[in-house]
C-alpha cells in the first residue's frame, strides 16, 4: 500500500482546497492508469489467439458486441483488423475505455467497471485455454489492479480539530470541509474504495473531538461503510500523556466501536511528538 497526504493536508494550509484535492486525485489516477494501459497493450499481444485454435469465448464476444455502440469507431476498426481474435479485440476496447477515463462518456465511470471487465476476461481465458503461459501474467496484473485500483496511492485527509468545534474563526474551513466529506462516497466509487484511507484530526484534545468528527461524517455520508478510518493526532504534551485514556474512552462508545469493525477492529493513532512547533519545543522533539 502506498499512501500520501499531498493534496489532502488541509491543516493550516489555506491553499489545500477541495479543488486542489480533486486535482491531486486525478494526477495520481492518471499515473496508475498509464501503467495499466501499457500492460493492456502487452497483454493484447499475448492473447492474439485466433478462434481457429481456441474455443469461442461467447460471453466475451457478447460484451464486445455491447461495446459496439459506446466505442463504435474503435469497435469497427478492431473487428476488421483482428476479426478472428476476440481476446485481443476486447483488450483493445478496454484500452480505449481506460484512455478516455474522466475525459468523455467512452471512459469507465468507475473502477468497478474496469474490474468487472478484467474478471470477465480472465474467466473466459480459463474456460477457453487449459494451459496458457500468459494466464499467470494476467493473474499478476489483476492482483496489481485490485491493490492500486484507479487511485494508485491512498490519500489521507487532514484537518484541525478547531474547524469542527464551531469556532467562528473557521466558518469558511468548516463549510469547505463539509463539502469534501460529502464527496468521499463519489470518490470511492470512481477511484476505488480505498482512495481515502483516513481522516486525520490534528490537535485532538479528547475523545469528544473524534466522536464529533464521527458524528459529522455519519450525518454527511449515507453509507456508513464509506466513512474512512478516523485518526486522532496527539501533538501537545498534555494530550500525549493522556492519549491512552482518550483512546480507552473512545472505545467505550458502542457506536464508534461498531464503526471499527469495518477496519478489522483496528484503530490508527498518530503521535506528533516530533513536531518542534508545538508546546514541547525543539529540544523535546529532537530528544524524542
State where each predicted segment sits.
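Extended, Lys/Arg-enriched charged tracts that mediate electrostatic binding to polyanionic substrates
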Residues: 1-2
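Conserved, mostly hydrophobic/aromatic
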Residues: 12, 149, 232
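Extended active-site and interfacial segments that coordinate phosphate-rich ligands
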Residues: 18-42
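Extended, charge-enriched "interface" segments that sit outside catalytic cores
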Residues: 45-190
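Active-site cores of enzymes that catalyze phosphoryl transfer or operate on phosphate-rich substrates
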Residues: 130, 135-215, 219-222, 237-287
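A conserved P-loop NTPase coupling/switch region
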Residues: 223-227
Amino acid at each position: 500500500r502506498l499512501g500520501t497526504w499531498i493534496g489532502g493536508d488541509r491543516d493550516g494550509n489555506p491553499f489545500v482546497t477541495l479543488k486542489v484535492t480533486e486535482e491531486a486525485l486525478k494526477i495520481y489516477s492518471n499515473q496508475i492508469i498509464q501503467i495499466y494501459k501499457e500492460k493492456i497493450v502487452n497483454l493484447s499481444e499475448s492473447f492474439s489467439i485466433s478462434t481457429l485454435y481456441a474455443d469461442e469465448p461467447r460471453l466475451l464476444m457478447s460484451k464486445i458486441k455491447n461495446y459496439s455502440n459506446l466505442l463504435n469507431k474503435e469497435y469497427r476498426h478492431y473487428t476488421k483488423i483482428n476479426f478472428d481474435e476476440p481476446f485481443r479485440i476486447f483488450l483493445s476496447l478496454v484500452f480505449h475505455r481506460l484512455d478516455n477515463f474522466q475525459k468523455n462518456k467512452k471512459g469507465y465511470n468507475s473502477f468497478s467497471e474496469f474490474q468487472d471487465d478484467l474478471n470477465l476476461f480472465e474467466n473466459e481465458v480459463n474456460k477457453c485455454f487449459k494451459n496458457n503461459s500468459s494466464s499467470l501474467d494476467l493473474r499478476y496484473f489483476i492482483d496489481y489492479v485490485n491493490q492500486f485500483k484507479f487511485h494508485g496511492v491512498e490519500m489521507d485527509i487532514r484537518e484541525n480539530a478547531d474547524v469542527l468545534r464551531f469556532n467562528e474563526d473557521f466558518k469558511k474551513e468548516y463549510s469547505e470541509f463539509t463539502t469534501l466529506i460529502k464527496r468521499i462516497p463519489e470518490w470511492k466509487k470512481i477511484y476505488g474504495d480505498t482512495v481515502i484511507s483516513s481522516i486525520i484530526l490534528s490537535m485532538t484534545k479528547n475523545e469528544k473531538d473524534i466522536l464529533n468528527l464521527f458524528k459529522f461524517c455519519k450525518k454527511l455520508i449515507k453509507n456508513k461503510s464509506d466513512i474512512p478510518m478516523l485518526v486522532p493526532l496527539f501533538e501537545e504534551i498534555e494530550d500525549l500523556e493522556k492519549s491512552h485514556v482518550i483512546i480507552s474512552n473512545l472505545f467505550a462508545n458502542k457506536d464508534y466501536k461498531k464503526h471499527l469493525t469495518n477496519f478489522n477492529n483496528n484503530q490508527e493513532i498518530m503521535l506528533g511528538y516530533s513536531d518542534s512547533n508545538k508546546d514541547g519545543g525543539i529540544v523535546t522533539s529532537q530528544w524524542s
